[in-house]
Curated annotation (Swiss-Prot):
Belongs to the RNA polymerase beta' chain family. It comes from Rhodopseudomonas palustris (strain HaA2). This is DNA-directed RNA polymerase subunit beta'. Keywords: DNA-directed RNA polymerase, Magnesium, Metal-binding, Nucleotidyltransferase, Transcription, Transferase, Zinc. DNA-dependent RNA polymerase catalyzes the transcription of DNA into RNA using the four ribonucleoside triphosphates as substrates. Its EC number is 2.7.7.6.
Length: 1400
């Protein structure tokens, strides 16, 4: 009954339950079926009566009444006349809400083309008809006729005729001998006449016959569109409109303003133009006006409809009265202000407030201070209902009055309402999920929100005027989710890396650091205390100091967990700190019996969380905070000018470096080094000096001094602050008391003259000026960075939003191999840190005993990782999101541990969004700059290799020569030195630079820190491999070589110049050859002549006739010139990698293993081919610009994947040559490199999730006997499905190769058109989806938000699962009933249906 009454009030049909949404092109019949009537007049409302005009754009007869249950003339009012149509004004009596739902239409007097299908590239109409857009526009806008039926004439079908040609043809052949038309009618006829099946077959034949790649692609594109129309049920002629739909009037309102004027939606103007022109055209046609006038009117109608659908896409933009472009239907959807992003994905919420935040140190971790005034406003409805329930008010109005007067009982009720009702606090910008957390409110006086100090790191909040917003979760479910999932106490670990994010900072750290200092020689040293009271008494009466070394009887737990006491040596302060540590076997006193820096505290919190659980951690954090604040206040640490200690040796170091710089200047003047080398050396010298001064300063500041009585004095305040991690860093201290050092120009280059002063001494005017560049550039960068970083996050979220954990285990045996990452001999990321919290892909075995440490499929916890480390395992295969075989989402095993909880990941976890946030959130900390070489980038080039381990040397691909100076020199590029420990495990491997001096040989034993090899970081040598006499080839003065006199030194050096640009130099091939005694060019051991090709900018080191030995340098290339490429760093580099762009100077990678051969050169390209080792394969050829330095010689042997030309490799090449695993490793490492430089920790799995999303498409190489088209890109899932189908039917299956798409492209090509349309290029996405008749299965998060459902992640996922189970059960019951009905003969009345609960 209730339902029926409700239906009375709700005349519109409720939204049906649907599983998917399909988009297609609307046919004229469909548009008419939506419509409630035709709009014949352009009028909107009557300006005297303000009533809508009949048949106008706001007509009440078509769209429904303006007031609820009241017709326009007022004859019928009230509910009882519901559904009656007034005979006077023809308006149906119903709810006025129907004006938001009912549509109208306009019958067009002449068909017009839909601009989206015409102009949105590629033009769908053009591709179907195989005509160019230019020709189509000529026909549509009445410039040319098109021949439809040539009849028996000489004209061709679809030939374009101008006006004169048309008339001439009519005269020549007679009027009825052929059919030609003009305008949209013509196109409509052409589209109508298409026989898609025939075209399809014809295209397939043509594709099979063609050899040209370009033609094949063109045919494939057309075939795709033909198939789209064949299979989607769309008819091509529907792309030409004969009826235009009119959207409901309440969606394009006309609002009266003060002063009798009206504000109107732009759509009304656009519709008005269409109606006016349409009516005029109808009238002209009735009047049989001349053709030219009618044609002009048709063209104007076409333009009006174009403007309505997409203003400004063709011709000039139509503007309103105030010269502002009118917003068309397409603009309503597009961009940040469009329907998708403004209203469907981003909604404003009620029950919210915002205020400034202040610190609340006395709060517990789960609390926040909420101003009373604010709470009263936010919780009003709850207060009203509670007042009513208590009988303090009878009506809402009365309750309102009570609340407004702020009566005492209202405050009591507010207390009750707020108890255990969490609120959400949010700080913009919300860069990751920790930007919104739930707290229990505590009422406070004042108007500022109080925030707990420990959650500041998660919100990235500080108290310099930041504001935060408060939201109230209303429903019980919302409160439950807030408490269980979003409470600040449930978010202790950072989702990006699994480290604690509830970490003390600043004052707290300083207080704890001060508390845990140990100083020798203080009064009372060595005393023994039995319990805390005794200790506190001694402290209070100043018998001992906090820092005194004492002994204390500590209550510990043994391995069985039984309590016992032991004597420990510690300080009084550390005992106080130990009191807050939870008692656990795993947490002995040693955990805190050391100097507590920020990092130490973080690790203690981590251990407490791992061993004692969440509740203990929260209590521990709160206590530690109170302790820290209290002791920071007690210590009273501050610093004065004298705390900045300038090292005594500063000026000595500065003077030495000055002389060094002068020497380099002199060497340059004498012509021994080039300008670039001088610059590099000077910059190098000064950065070394700065480092040294900083070291000296740190030594002096951190020095332990003793007073007269032999007790250690308190350590320097500045040092305490920096060392503890409370504030400041060694880099900042260096500027305060050391020397400021080198500064960068705005271009990123480094200025050669450093700033020698520090801030204590003060800068000179010139020094200050030099330092302003960097400071100003920093500010400009920050502004740009924020926008760029936000856009990167948005693209990442979009590409990964449908990545959800949907199952426990996909059962794959694939995985990726993990090793420690070693850079320049130091371990940057240990194996343990990379495999922690991942699932083992196979059994991990001890290399010595071969026993299994971790079983296959086991999640590796801390203890497993420790065991793997102890066993010395070098490589572990783990499961990865990249190799997960689920169709939708990822399985729990492949993902591993949920980093924010430290447990296996739950079903429904939105890992894609978490990954995107984890990568995007630190984006603002990355630099924007592209490093220009010639500065900082060279300084961190390393030029020696030292061993980090002890062991024996094993050399792979060994080729060492002794040169003329009797040094051992590396002669090949792929030589690797490995250090092996006694039991044969490889401890480290080092790739040796070509031309490096070797300090060790095969079989040598090395100690830690011993040099293995060194080389000149500033130049690359060309070495000879044979002994003989030098001769030059094609080194012609002023054509390929020039003697440059260094202007400042007058010394000549010979440099190879660009010979292509000189006259007569095009065919030269400059080289140095080594000849034997007989005057013939010597042969090399690997075949080929001893001829060394030179590249541009090589500096010769030998003369004609010089005698050389193997390993001698013939020429050198200054790295400055070999490396003029920019190193893209920071954010742009991350974006470049995720977008899978080809780097500017991309490396050329060998596709096969083989021998290098130099072919005949072209004018400005050099031809290199690789002869394969395997005779089955074909040789590969590469063309390389001549200016590029090729460091390979004829006859060198390269492996598959080696670089032929140095540079950053293009990710697509890596995928094609080395496969998915290598590509993933490359992308993960490169992206991590950028973040590591900034000290940001991100777990590899996040990057893997994004890379998985980039690898979802397959390019078809051979279509087999399937419906796929070779050369097209198709979803991996679809590819597998179609192949499975073909396999079942016994047909030949298609083959394909994986393609890597950039994140923007991948987002636009997702299976969901809703998601793609709301991301970018809305028009294009919707056009394509409509043509293909795409179905959106509503699987991702975005699509579900858009259609207003729970997202299929988190709680939404479990709800969906329950719904599925329920539907299955219902189906079973119904099937059972049907079965029963068929079995039992109808004659027997006593047969009851199955006794099952009724189905609602």
């Amino acid at each position: 009954m209730n339902q029926e009454i409700m239906n009375l009030f709700n005349p519109t049909t409720p939204a049906q339950v649907f599983d998917q949404i399909r988009i297609s092109i609307a046919s004229p019949e469909k548009i008419l079926s939506w419509s409630y009537g035709e709009i014949k007049k352009p009028e909107t409302i009557n300006y005297r009566t303000f009533k809508p005009e009949r048949d106008g754009l706001f007509c009440a007869r078509i769209f429904g009444p303006i007031k609820d249950y009241e017709c326009l003339c007022g004859k019928y009012k009230r509910m009882k006349y519901k559904g009656i149509i007034c005979e006077k004004c023809s308006v149906e009596v119903t709810l006025s809400r129907v004006r938001r739902e009912r549509m109208g239409h306009i019958e067009l007097a002449a068909p017009v083309a839909h601009i989206w299908f015409l102009k949105s590239l590629p033009s769908r109409i053009g591709q179907l008809l195989d005509m160019t857009l230019k020709d189509l526009e000529r026909i549509l806008y009445f410039e040319y006729y098109v021949v439809l039926e040539p009849g028996l004439t000489d004209l061709k079908e679809r030939q374009l005729l101008s006006e004169e040609e048309y008339l001439r043809a009519q005269d020549q052949y007679g009027q009825d001998s052929f059919t030609a038309m003009i305008g949209a009618e013509a196109i409509r006829e052409l589209l109508k006449g298409l026989e898609l099946e025939k075209i399809d077959a014809q295209l397939r034949v043509e594709m099979a016959e063609t050899d040209s790649d370009i033609k094949h692609k063109k045919l494939a594109k057309r075939l795709k569109i033909v198939e789209a129309f064949r299979f989607s049920g769309n008819k091509p002629e529907w792309m030409i409109l004969t009826v235009v739909p009119v959207i409901p009037p309440d969606l394009r309102p006309l609002v009266p303003l003060d002063g009798g004027r009206f504000a109107t939606s732009d759509l009304n103007d656009l519709y008005r133009r269409v109606i006016n022109r349409n009516n005029r055209l109808k009238r002209l046609m009735e009047l049989r006006a001349p053709d030219i006038i009618i044609r002009n009117e048709k063209r104007m109608l076409q333009e009006a409809v174009d403007a309505l659908f997409d203003n400004g896409r063709r011709g000039r933009v139509i503007t309103g009265a105030n010269k502002r472009p009118l917003k068309s239907l397409a603009d309503m959807l597009k961009g940040k202000q469009g329907r998708f992003r403004q209203n469907l994905l981003g909604k404003r919420v009620d029950y919210s407030g915002r205020s400034v935040i202040v610190v609340g140190p006395e709060l517990k971790l789960h609390q926040c201070g909420l101003p009373k005034k604010m709470a009263l406003e936010l919780f009003k409805p709850f207060i009203y209902s509670r007042l009513d329930a208590k009988g303090l008010s009878t009506t809402v109005k009365q309750a309102k009055k009570l609340v407004e007067k702020e009566r005492p009982e209202v405050w009591d009720i507010l207390d009750e309402v707020i108890r255990e009702h969490p609120v959400l606090l949010n700080r913009a910008p919300t860069l990751h999920r920790l930007g919104i957390q739930a707290f229990e409110p505590v009422l406070i006086e004042g108007k500022a929100i109080q925030l707990h100090p420990l959650v500041c790191a998660a919100f990235n909040a500080d108290f310099d005027g930041d504001q935060m917003a408060v939201h109230v979760p209303l429903s019980l479910e919302a409160q439950l989710e807030a408490r269980v999932l979003m409470m600040s106490t449930n978010n202790i670990l950072h989702p990006a890396n699994g480290q604690p994010i509830i970490v003390p900072s600043q004052d707290i750290v300083l207080g704890l650091y001060y508390l845990s200092i140990l100083r020798e020689g203080l009064p009372g040293e060595g005393k023994v205390f039995g319990d805390l009271a005794e200790l506190e008494h001694a402290l209070f009466s100043k018998v001992i100091h906090l820092h005194t070394k004492i002994k204390y009887r500590w209550d510990s737990l043994d391995d069985e967990g039984k309590p016992y006491q032991r004597l420990i040596e510690t300080t009084a302060g550390r005992i106080l700190l130990g009191q807050v540590l939870p008692k656990s076997v795993k947490l002995p006193f040693e955990v805190i019996n050391k100097l507590m820096t920020k990092r130490e505290i973080s690790s203690v919190i981590d251990q407490v969380y791992r061993h004692c659980g969440q509740k203990e951690t929260v209590i521990f954090c709160d206590r530690i905070m109170a302790l820290g604040f209290f002791n920071a206040f007690k210590a009273g640490i501050s610093f004065g000018k004298d705390d900045m200690v300038v090292p005594a040796s500063k000026w000595k170091i500065v003077d030495t470096t000055r002389t060094l710089a002068k020497d380099f200047e002199q060497q340059y003047n004498d012509g021994l080094i080039t300008h670039g080398e001088k610059y590099n050396k000077v910059v190098d010298a000064w950065s070394k000096a700065t480092e040294e001064i900083a070291k000296e300063m740190m030594k002096e500041i951190s020095a332990v001094r003793k007073n007269a009585s032999g007790a250690e004095t308190q350590v320097n305040s500045i040092y305490m602050m920096a060392h503890s991690g409370a504030r400041g860093s060694p880099a900042q201290m260096r500027q305060l008391a050391g020397m400021r050092g080198l500064m960068a120009k705005p271009s990123g280059e480094i200025i050669e003259t450093p700033i020698i002063s520090n801030f204590k001494e003060g800068l000179s005017v010139l020094e200050y000026f030099n330092s302003t560049h960097g400071a100003r550039k920093g500010l400009a960068d920050t502004a740009l960075k924020t926008a760029n970083s936000g856009y990167l996050t948005r693209r990442l979220v979009d590409v990964a939003q449908d990545c959800i954990i949907t199952q426990d285990d996909c059962g794959t045996s694939l995985g990726i191999k993990m090793r420690a990452i070693i850079d320049a001999g130091t371990v940057v990321a240990s194996l343990g840190s990379r495999i922690l919290g991942r699932t083992a892909g196979e059994d991990v075995r001890d290399p010595q005993t071969n026993e299994v440490i971790v079983k296959k499929g086991q999640l590796m916890e801390e203890r497993d990782v420790e065991a793997i480390h102890q066993a010395g395992v070098q490589e572990v295969k783990i499961r990865s999101a990249l190799t997960c075989e689920l169709v939708n989402g990822i399985c729990g095993k492949c993902y591993g541990r949920d980093l924010a909880r430290g447990t296996p990941v739950n079903h429904g976890e939105a890992v894609g969004v978490i990954a995107a946030q984890s990568i995007g959130e630190p984006g603002t900390q990355l630099t924007m700059r592209t490093f220009h070489i010639g500065g900082a980038a060279q300084i961190n080039e390393q030029s020696v290799i030292e061993s980090n381990f002890e062991g024996k040397v094993v050399i792979k691909n060994k080729a060492i020569a002794r040169n003329g100076e009797n040094h051992s020199v590396a002669m090949v590029r792929n030589m690797v030195v490995a250090i092996v420990d006694p039991d044969g495990t490889e401890r480290a491997t080092h790739r040796i630079q070509y031309g490096a001096r070797m300090h060790v040989d095969e079989g040598d034993t090395v100690k830690r820190g011993q040099r293995i090899a060194e080389w000149d970081p500033y130049s690359r040598p060309v070495l000879t491999e044979v002994e003989g006499t030098i001769d030059f080839e094609d080194l012609v003065e002023d054509q390929s070589i020039s003697e440059t006199l260094d202007e400042s030194t007058g010394i000549a050096k010979r440099i190879v110049i660009d010979w292509r640009s000189t006259r007569g130099g095009a065919d030269l091939r400059p080289a140095i050859v080594v000849k034997g005694k007989d005057g013939k060019v010597l042969k090399l051991a690997r075949g080929g002549d001893a001829r060394y090709m030179l590249s541009v900018d090589a500096i010769l080191s030998v003369d004609v006739g010089a005698k050389v030995k193997p390993g001698d340098i013939l020429a050198r290339i200054s790295t400055e010139s070999a490396k003029t490429r920019d190193i893209t760093g920071g954010l742009p580099r991350v974006a470049e990698l995720f977008e899978a762009r080809k780097p500017k100077d991309a490396a050329i990678i060998a596709e096969i293993a083989g021998t290098i051969r130099f072919g005949r050169d072209y004018k400005n390209k050099r031809r290199i081919s690789i002869e394969p080792m395997d005779s089955e394969e074909e040789a590969r050829e590469y063309l390389i610009p001549k200016g590029k330095h090729i460091h390979l010689q004829d006859g060198d042997i390269v492996e598959k994947g080696d670089f032929i030309v140095e540079g950053n490799p293009a990710p697509h090449d890596i995928l094609a040559i080395k496969g998915i695993e290598e590509l993933a490793a490359y992308l993960v490492n490169e992206i991590q490199e950028v973040y590591r430089l900034q000290g940001v920790l991100i777990n590899d799995k996040h990057i893997e999730v994004i890379v998985r999303q980039m690898l979802q498409k397959v390019e078809i190489t051979d279509q087999g006997e399937t419906d796929m088209i070779s050369g097209e890109q198709i979803d991996k899932i679809e590819f597998d499905q179609l192949n499975a189908k073909a396999r079942d039917e016994g047909k030949k299956i298609a083959t394909g190769t994986p393609v890597l798409l950039g994140i923007t492209k991948a987002s636009l090509q997702t299976r969901s058109f809703f998601s793609a349309a709301s991301f970018q290029e809305t028009t294009r996405v919707l056009t394509e989806a409509a043509v293909n008749g795409k179905v959106d299965p509503l699987e991702g998060l975005k699509e579900n938000v858009i259609v207003g459902r729970l997202i299929p992640a988190g709680t939404g996922a479990s709800m969906a699962k329950l719904r599925e189970v329920a539907m299955k059960r219902d189906r079973m019951i119904l099937d059972e009933r049907e079965k029963q009905a068929t079995i039992v003969p109808p004659a027997a009345p006593e047969a009851e249906p199955l006794a099952l609960p009724p189905v609602e």
